[in-house]
Amino acid sequence: MTQDEMKKAAGWAALEYVTKGSIVGVGTGSTVNHFIDALETRKEEIKGAVSSSVASTERLEKLGIPVFEANEVAGLDIYVDGADEINAEYDMIKGGGAALTREKIVAAISDKFICIVDDTKQVDVLGQFPLPVEVIPMARSFIGRELVKLGGDPEYREGVVTDNGNIIIDVHNMAITDAKDMEKKINALPGVVTVGLFAARGADVLLVGAPEGVRKFEK
């Protein structure tokens, strides 16, 4: 089974959590694209989706799935999204696709976070994948210096502007043993919109596409 086939298996497995008449929180990325394609088969049963990015909104609308703004809903039953890394505590690094802030908002208004990944994304310690930080442009140099103090090697992601009009700094060479504490420290820096650590609000369900099929884990 190829990596993309494992992503597809995880994406389709998340359909089990979609309930009739609901509005579904939808993340961003290659694995989520498979979930969106799967969701099309249930589009007559659901009211629609809240999307975490322009890219996902375009894919949903192309398939005829109504998209609501986050401000139009009081809450969501589920949020389905991928991860760049996830550890045994269900803490995640997300934001490789630069949609981390909107992903964090949609996750926050959802009762259950369902993380869909292939088995290469499971790690013992977070940080091998560069940690994305969304930053207001005028704070770029200051935040870079502060991230060095926290033990990282920051790199400006050239040519990338988030859906919110901000920039991304990727932090390399961080072994993150206390994800909640690091999330709090980076989020407290003036000029940071949010960091791509999802630990304060981690995943509740993990669906892992693997060569032998989909492995399911729940908190």
Curated annotation (Swiss-Prot):
Gene3D superfamilies per the UniProt record, alphabetical: 3.30.70.260, 3.40.50.1360
Binding site for substrate: T28, G29, S30, T31, D81, G82, A83, D84, K94, G95, G96, G97, K121
CDD domains documented for this protein: RPI_A
Main EC class the enzyme belongs to: isomerase
Catalytic activity: aldehydo-D-ribose 5-phosphate = D-ribulose 5-phosphate
Top-level taxon: Bacteria
Protein EC: 5.3.1.6
Pathway assigned in UniProt: Carbohydrate degradation; pentose phosphate pathway; D-ribose 5-phosphate from D-ribulose 5-phosphate (non-oxidative stage): step 1/1
Entry annotated with the keyword Lyase: no
Function of the molecule: Catalyzes the reversible conversion of ribose-5-phosphate to ribulose 5-phosphate.
Family listed: Belongs to the ribose 5-phosphate isomerase family.
Name of the protein in its database record: Ribose-5-phosphate isomerase A
Source organism per UniProt: Photobacterium profundum (strain SS9)
Source species taxonomy: Bacteria, Pseudomonadati, Pseudomonadota, Gammaproteobacteria, Vibrionales
